[in-house]
């Protein structure tokens, strides 16, 4: 039935959004459903042919005017719904890629050690190109006149100045205003949030 494939994409987007929210953004982006998208585009192409046929038959007076208008209108609605489903799916994945780029401080994620081969395989070729160019834009922006401003910092002011954190993976020593911390997996620290916010975003630390 027309629209079933688009509905699958929407459900997949909802699952991805919920998973991403629950895991505090520390999750792999699911595989890009290229086959479903290709079939949706094929479906849209068939629907367009149907609209052209219905319009032609209506102009020739070979179909009942009310029936033809109803068929034509429903077919257009199916095309529009498929378009909205595709855009919603692509927009969600693009927003997640943007967030990943900012969380990595604008560094090239495709060559980052935190970006696994599975992460790369889950992206379409166009998404890989988009992510690389978006990271380049962030790098250029932060190396210009705004180099002294932390553009990747959170827009929400912290509720606590100092927080307890747990180390999720080894990160070595970090120098802060209050001393040096050796971040060893499973260790805990009471630190100033602004000093470790970047490490939290990158997945090295977890706020307790």
Swiss-Prot record:
GO CC terms of this entry: CMG complex; DNA replication preinitiation complex; GINS complex; nuclear replication fork; nucleus
Keywords, sorted A to Z: Cell cycle, DNA replication, Nucleus
Oligomer status and interactors: Component of the GINS complex which is a heterotetramer of SLD5, PSF1, PSF2 and PSF3. Interacts with PSF2.
Name the record gives this protein: DNA replication complex GINS protein PSF1
SUPFAM superfamilies: GINS helical bundle-like (SSF158573)
Family per similarity comment: Belongs to the GINS1/PSF1 family.
Highest rank taxon of the organism: Eukaryota
InterPro entries the record matches: GINS_A, GINS_bundle-like_dom_sf, GINS_Psf1, PSF1_C
PANTHER family per UniProt: DNA REPLICATION COMPLEX GINS PROTEIN PSF1 (PTHR12914:SF2), PARTNER OF SLD5 (PTHR12914)
Pfam families per UniProt: PSF1_C, Sld5
BP GO terms, sorted: DNA strand elongation involved in mitotic DNA replication; DNA-templated DNA replication; double-strand break repair via break-induced replication
Function: Required for DNA replication. Functions as part of the GINS complex which plays an essential role in the initiation of DNA replication by binding to DNA replication origins and facilitating the assembly of the DNA replication machinery. Required for the chromatin binding of CDC45.
Cellular localization per UniProt: Nucleus
Leftover remarks: Present with 1431 molecules/cell in log phase SD medium.
């Amino acid at each position: 039935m027309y629209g079933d494939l688009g509905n699958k994409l929407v459900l997949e987007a909802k699952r991805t959004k919920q998973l991403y929210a629950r895991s505090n953004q520390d999750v792999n982006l699911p595989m890009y459903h290229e086959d479903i998208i290709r079939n949706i585009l094929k479906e849209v192409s068939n629907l367009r042919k149907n609209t052209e046929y219905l319009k032609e038959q209506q102009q020739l007076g070979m179909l009942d005017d009310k029936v033809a208008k109803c068929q034509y209108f429903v077919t257009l609605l199916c095309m529009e719904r498929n378009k909205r489903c595709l855009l919603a799916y692509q927009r969600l994945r693009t927003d997640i890629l943007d967030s990943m780029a900012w969380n990595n401080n604008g560094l090239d994620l495709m060559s980052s050690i935190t970006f696994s081969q599975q992460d790369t395989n889950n992206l379409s070729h166009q998404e890989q190109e988009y992510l690389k160019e978006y990271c380049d834009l962030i790098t250029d922006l932060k190396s210009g006149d705004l180099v002294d401003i932390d553009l990747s910092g959170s827009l929400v002011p912290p509720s606590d100045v100092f927080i307890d954190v747990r180390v999720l993976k080894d990160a070595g020593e970090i120098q802060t205003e209050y001393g040096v911390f050796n971040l060893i997996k499973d260790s805990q620290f009471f630190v100033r949030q602004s000093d470790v916010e970047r490490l939290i975003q990158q997945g090295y630390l977890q706020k307790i």
